[in-house]
Every structure is written in C-alpha cells, then in structure tokens.
Amino acid sequence: MIRVELPYHLRNLAQVDREVSLVVDGPVTQRAVLDALETTYPMLRGTIRDHTTQIRRPFLRFFACSQDLSHESPDAPLPAAVVAGEEPFSIV
C-alpha cells in the first residue's frame, strides 16, 4: 500500500482524511501513484495534473522522504521507503 498525503483543498474535494492508502500495480512512480489516486477518487482528475498534458499543476509540489520530487521525471521510481509504505508521498 502506498500512503498519499493530500492538502486541505483536495481532501475536501475528495471527502477523505489527510492520508489515503492506494494499491499501485507495477513500478511505483509518480505517474502510477497519481493514476491510482485519480482512479480511486475521480473528482481529483485535473486538479493535480493538467487533463491534456498530464503535467503537474504549477501550484502543487510533490515530496517524499524529505525530498522535493516536483521536477523529477513522472516515470522515475519513488524512494524505497514510499514503496514499502514507511513514508508517505505528499502532495502540497
């Protein structure tokens, strides 16, 4: 299970708590996590990434293991602690 922390406005929109748990099939990347998040919570589609380009919205940042991953490739593997569920993938 991958843990994802959401900011207040996205929590309100999805009607969830601060942290959600997701099952991600295949390699755990930003793209895979966001795809799983948008599949589980369709009301979040287009709020984190642009509908057409799938590029991160400029007002959001991605963090994991105290690292800013916002400018990393969306297909780069996430840190092992995130994959193991020890640390959350944070959307700020």
Which residues are covered by each model-predicted region?
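Ubiquitin-like/PB1-type beta-grasp interaction modules and other compact soluble beta-rich domains
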Residues: M1-V92
